[in-house]
């Protein structure tokens, strides 16, 4: 089974307490918060007998931000305009499971999220160690798990 979910944010307007428009919008990173223009999740599930497997790809479109005081440093991708581009990022998750026929309703699943250990892009306007934790996986974020499901 395959599924593909996409979200496009065409417009976003935030208004502050005093009624002023905030500098936030689709594709813009501002102070630890981003609204990606595109997000996409593709999932491929396979089942055969007692076995199951899945691959999920999560994609976040590129973001732009102000370089601020870092405009003079190489980490700012476009010092001429004072903007930095956080490149599009994709994460890959895999899992495999087995349903035990002797224990009706028991399934064991082994999986890994962010299988290729993709680090988030460097964010100059973010205060949390240079990345946006609300948008991206944590640095060094490969995560292994074991899950047991019991249905009765």
Residue ranges and their predicted role:
Residues 1-67:
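Gram-negative outer-membrane beta-barrel transporters
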Residues 13, 58-69, 98-152:
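C-terminal beta-signal and adjacent terminal beta-strands/loops
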Residues 8, 95-100:
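Short, well-ordered turn and helix-capping elements at secondary-structure junctions
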Residues 25-31, 72-73, 78-84, 131-136:
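Extracellular loop and loop/strand-boundary signature of outer-membrane beta-barrel proteins
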Residues 36-40, 88-92, 140-144:
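Residues that define the transmembrane beta-barrel architecture of outer-membrane proteins
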Residues 54-93:
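Extracytoplasmic gating/loop element in the C-terminal half of outer-membrane beta-barrel translocons
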Residues 42, 53, 94-96, 146-148:
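Membrane-embedded beta-strands of outer-membrane beta-barrel proteins
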């Amino acid at each position: 089974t395959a599924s593909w979910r996409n979200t496009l944010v065409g417009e976003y307007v935030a208004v502050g307490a005093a009624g002023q428009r905030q500098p936030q919008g689709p594709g813009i990173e501002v102070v630890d918060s981003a609204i990606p223009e595109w997000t996409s999740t593709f999932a491929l599930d396979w089942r055969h007998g007692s076995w199951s497997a899945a691959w999920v790809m999560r994609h976040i479109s590129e973001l732009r931000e102000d370089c601020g005081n870092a405009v003079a440093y190489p980490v700012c991708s476009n010092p001429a305009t004072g903007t930095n581009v956080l490149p599009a990022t994709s994460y890959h998750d895999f899992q495999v499971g087995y349903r035990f026929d002797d224990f009706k309703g028991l399934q064991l699943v082994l999986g890994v999220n962010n299988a290729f250990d993709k680090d988030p892009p460097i964010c100059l306007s973010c205060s949390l160690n240079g990345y946006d934790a609300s948008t991206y996986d944590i640095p060094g974020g490969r995560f292994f798990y074991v899950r047991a499901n019991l249905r009765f």
